[in-house]
Amino acid sequence: MIKRGHEPGAGLWSIPGGRIEPGETDAEALVREMFEETGLAVEVGPLIGSVRRPGLDGAVIDIRDYAATVTGGTLRPGDDAAAARWLEAADLDSLEITEGLIEALTDWGVLGQ
């Protein structure tokens, strides 16, 4: 997970992510964002869930989260990430997490009930 360095969610822990650039597929954006924010190379897996959240200035953000397998690199914060680290599900209760993330991951079956 990463600790967001900028708004929205500055200072909160979340899953790495970001905007899809013009012409990019979801998979291409995921690979790019993971490397930019964590230094990790990944292979994209299946979609695990999607959600809509309010953004800045009344915008709506469509979030699509995918499973991914790390294939290389060294974990380090970069780009929008102020920090990056591996976490166990039990660690999440002790961190300030972006709104709705725990609920979404639980609903999608990523975290236990």
Cite the ranges covered by each PLM segment.
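The catalytic Nudix box helix
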Residues: I15-I48
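Generic beta-structure capping elements
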Residues: I2-G5, G18, T69, D80, ...
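N-terminal strand-loop-strand
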Residues: M1-W13, V42, P46, A68
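Residues at secondary-structure transition points
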Residues: A10, G17-T25, L56-D57, I61, ...
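Hydrophobic pocket/interface hotspot
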Residues: I2, L30, M34, A84
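Nudix hydrolase/Nudix homology domain
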Residues: P8-W13, R76-Q113
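Active-site-adjacent beta-strand/loop module that shapes the phosphate/pyrophosphate-binding cleft
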Residues: V51-T74, R85
